[in-house]
UniProtKB/Swiss-Prot annotation:
The protein's name in its UniProt record: Heat-inducible transcription repressor HrcA
Organism: Polaromonas sp. (strain JS666 / ATCC BAA-500)
Family per record: Belongs to the HrcA family.
One GO biological process term: negative regulation of DNA-templated transcription
GO MF: DNA binding
UniProt keywords, alphabetically: Repressor, Stress response, Transcription, Transcription regulation
Gene from which this protein is expressed: hrcA
Transmembrane segments: none
Amino acid sequence: MLDDRARLLLKALVERYIADGQPVGSRTLSRASGLELSPATIRNVMSDLEELGLIVSPHTSAGRIPTARGYRLFVDTMLTTQRDQLSAGHITAPRLAPDQPQKVISNAAHMLSSLSQFVGVVMAPRRTSVFRHIEFLRLSEKRFLVIIVSPDGDVQNRVIFTEADYTQSQLIEASNFLNSHYAGMAIEEVRERLQNEVEALRGEIATLMQAAVQVSSEAIESRDEVVVSGERNLLAVSDFSSDMGNLRKLFDLFEQKAQLMRLLDVSSRAEGVRIYIGGESQVIPYQELSVVTAPYEVDGQVVGTLGVIGPMRMPYEKMIQIVDITSKLVSTALSHSK
């Protein structure tokens, strides 16, 4: 347990290091803390903080920098978020395009990266495999294009190969049947109904429709579930730019998205803003990163998560506000878009 003096000095050290990225010495800390303490006293307190694993001395400097544990204590007990510095009115809602749900997600990721100057990530709302409309186009013998339109207006194209050939009139017949009987249903339900009704349909048409239902399910479920924006912002972060190996790993992380998806999925089960410092998430194995996330809702039900990814040396107060307000704006925009 830290006494008040140690807490004030740790808070001042973390804030100073976040501000300029330089190891903090005793003289600088004395000025930053506002405490009338001798350099020797401050050095003794810093030594105690170092023994507790809250700060560390880089090999190249006599100053100290916070550890992940030090940042955690700072975030949990020392933050004083100034709500008047950033408001929902400052982050303008119209840019979220509430009448276009797909743009809400991509615009939110861009807003997060633009406001934070780090990386913005948004996990798209969990999708159920539902189609709104389906069409077939004959490309060549036994080769057809399936055009699938999802409920949110996204269009996916898939090529299928069949054992039998079909005329364009047969393709129209199949698409009309699927659209009139099954549009808006879950793909699994469509598959079951087709299985039950296959005897009432002509065999070759039933086979075509079953193939179409399968590729529709794969197309809808394979869409990117995480939107990432602002990866290049990390090139300007000195904590990363000096280590090209780490940068490559980070860009791989953003490109592959699987680890991001797992982290955001876990975060969606928590209430409010969550902060992962260093390796705390146990999902993203990068000690130098911090992630600030918050879930968003549609009509009161959590459907996804968004957040900011940046260095441990980030202004946490500002990031918390950006993520919190953006999640509320996204929730409002998506709820109004229905």
